[in-house]
Amino acid sequence: MSVLFISDLHLEAERPDITRAFLSFLDERARRAEALYILGDFFEAWIGDDGMDAFQHSIASALRQVADGGTRLYLMHGNRDFLIGQAFCREAGCTLLPDPSVIDLYGEPVLLMHGDSLCTRDEAYMRLRRWLRNPLTLWVLRHLPLATRHKLARKLRKESRAQTRMKAVDIIDVTPDEVPLAMRRHGVRTLIHGHTHRPAEHALEVDGQPARRIVLGDWDRQGWALEIDANGHRQAPFPL
């Protein structure tokens, strides 16, 4: 059996093509896998488990069916859905992973991240990230009225899109020097992350030893999945 990794689906009711592709992916591939790891930005936005709508409940139900079939499900926060909590995870049958996390993958320690924390050259975003992830900020956000949270989420998404268009490509990508630092800190030679929407595999050295960074693809014009088993790994796109 294999282990699957996906990220950056940005699921929302307004993109039924992505939803259909994801449900097919669950039926055709995830049910046969040992585990599925979703490394952030699973949803386009998340205002809190208490604000789940019918669409989000339907996604949780689909995940639960896969979990009940024996596939282990793991979910990591992204920059769009960091308010996902234990209520959703219980409903979906998945385990919420901290970012970063180290897992044992066929005898090798592997570092998993969403990836946004590696983009340190984007100083404005890093300041916003630190503020949003502050425990006090999280508490306040979760206790705001739902209508206020919806309004704030729309505002943040609009500003994020505008700023991304204005920033240089290298600013919003991973800072190269941060990668070996993170890998050395966690004692790994393999890092898997998403966030940048630039699927690729990068070779590097950490303390003189060969290492690799696998970047997951986003689900916009096509879907992406990384599949790893005891014999190797393969990341490939597929149509929505």
From Swiss-Prot:
Organism of provenance: Pseudomonas paraeruginosa (strain DSM 24068 / PA7)
Protein name (Swiss-Prot/TrEMBL): UDP-2,3-diacylglucosamine hydrolase
Alphabetized UniProt keyword annotations: Cell inner membrane, Cell membrane, Hydrolase, Lipid A biosynthesis, Lipid biosynthesis, Lipid metabolism, Manganese, Membrane, Metal-binding
Cofactor, free-text remark: Binds 2 Mn(2+) ions per subunit in a binuclear metal center.
Record's subcellular location: Cell inner membrane
Main location class: membrane
Similarity comment: Belongs to the LpxH family.
Catalytic activity reported: UDP-2-N,3-O-bis[(3R)-3-hydroxytetradecanoyl]-alpha-D-glucosamine + H2O = 2-N,3-O-bis[(3R)-3-hydroxytetradecanoyl]-alpha-D-glucosaminyl 1-phosphate + UMP + 2 H(+)
Gene name tied to this protein: lpxH
